[in-house]
Amino acid sequence: CYEINGELLLIDCGVLFPEDDHPGVDLLLPHLDYLDDDKLSRVKALLLTHGHEDHIGAVPFLLKRRPDIPVYGSKLTLALVEAKLKEHRIRNYDLRVVREGDTAEIGEEFDVEFVAVNHSIPDALAIYVKTDAGSILNTGDFKMDQLPIDGRITDLRAFAKLGEEGVDVFMVDSTNAEVPGFVRSERDLAPAIEQTFDQATQKLIVATFASHVHRVQQAVDAAVRHGR
C-alpha cells in the first residue's frame, strides 16, 4: 500500500497457506483492517502483478468492503480474479485489463507503467509507479527464462530504460532467491515429459500446479501426440 497526499494505491492482495503449526486454518489473510473506512475510501486502485494465490487470493475479501475499487491486471490475471469474485457473489466490480507497455494515470498522484515479466504463470507484469515524491518499481514474481513456451520474456530493455529514468525504491519479489544457481527454462522439461510418455505402458497421472499453464499445455500436447 502506497500513500501520498491522501491518495492510496494498492499492489497485489494475496493469501498465504498455513504451515503444519496452523491446524484447522484454511487461509492466512493480510491485515486488511489497516484499511479503515477512511483509508478505504481513499484507495484509487488495486494493481495486480499476476494470478497466483499469494498475489490475488484476498481480492474478494477486500472488494466485499468496497467493490468499486478499480482493479488493474492482465487478461489472465483478471479472469482468475473474476472467477473468485463470482464465487464470493460480489457484484458491480471494476476490472480493467492492461498489457505490457500500457500506462495509466491513477487519481491525482500516481502515474503507472506495466512491464512484461516471465513467470510460471502467463501474463505476469511488473509495475512502475511514479509520483511527485519519487518512483517505485515493483517486479512481482519473475524469472529469467530466455526461451519460454509463449515467447514472452522478462523485458530487460524496459527495466534498463526505467533505471536510466531513475528508480527510488526497487521492490523485488524473492521467491527461491536463497537457492543457489539458476532456474531451468520451462522448455527444457519437454524432453523429460516426452520420455515419460514414451516409457509409460499403463495409466499416466500428471501432477502439477493448476496455474502452471505452460507445463499443463506441454503435458496435454504430449498426450495428444501419444494418443492418450
What are the roles of these predicted feature ranges?
Residues 1-47, 52-227:
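His/Asp/Glu-rich metal-coordinating catalytic cores
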